[in-house]
């Protein structure tokens, strides 16, 4: 059986931030890793002053530029199969919730779910992934494109139960987020998540007990950081994060976490799965249902 992993992300850089180490980890094992990106990230904030004219409120050319950044990130992660949902530019970055960009006629937030899911079904039937990763129903932190990616992916997976065995949402457990803040502060970063006093009030943080799966990809943290560096318009490459090399930093950013949404969990000794493909060879086609 050829193992195949499909990830559905909203914008360029999302793949590297939340699942980059996982992608590199499985690609290095010879797993077929396919990344589907739903938009070009046209509404992203540009951190490079010389490229400010590419912004949505200027020349509106950021999306095209980010295609090259995404290609470099995929190369850093060892991923060779990348696709845009419906083709590059079919769906536009919707911007943050409640902004005018939500109403753009091509905004992903406005996409017809059946049409968008059909594009993804075609990809699933092509690459035949046993495992699919996207976001939870809140899109992690409530971004409309993340929410829409969840909806589209769930709809597509429910139509391809003969192929997909397990569906996961990328997640950040409370303990890992607290550890990450500690690592950033130790590295001299006093601005990231400034003012966060109660971790439980951070929108994308989930209780530890709902996390079903932890992928220890610390050996591939360097590839994740290289992929993040590739997204130079979006991520400050000179920040303390990129100097993280201590054990706390490796543990906080090199272990990635997931919640099983469809399929059956096969936990290891610590009560969590340590392999996304655990159990896929014992599940019969058509058995995919709500997570158990």
Swiss-Prot record:
Binds 1 zinc ion per subunit. The keyword DNA repair does not apply. The keyword Cytoplasm does not apply. One of its GO terms (biological process) is mycothiol biosynthetic process. Signal peptide: none annotated. InterPro entries: GlcNAc_PI_deacetylase-related, LmbE-like_dom_sf, Mycothiol_biosynthesis_MshB. Zn(2+) binds at residues 11, 14, 146. Its EC number is 3.5.1.103. Its cofactor is Zn(2+). Pfam families: PIG-L. It catalyses: 1D-myo-inositol 2-acetamido-2-deoxy-alpha-D-glucopyranoside + H2O = 1D-myo-inositol 2-amino-2-deoxy-alpha-D-glucopyranoside + acetate. Coiled coil: none annotated. Keywords: Hydrolase, Metal-binding, Zinc. Gene3D superfamilies: LmbE-like. Catalyzes the deacetylation of 1D-myo-inositol 2-acetamido-2-deoxy-alpha-D-glucopyranoside (GlcNAc-Ins) in the mycothiol biosynthesis pathway. Belongs to the MshB deacetylase family. This is 1D-myo-inositol 2-acetamido-2-deoxy-alpha-D-glucopyranoside deacetylase.
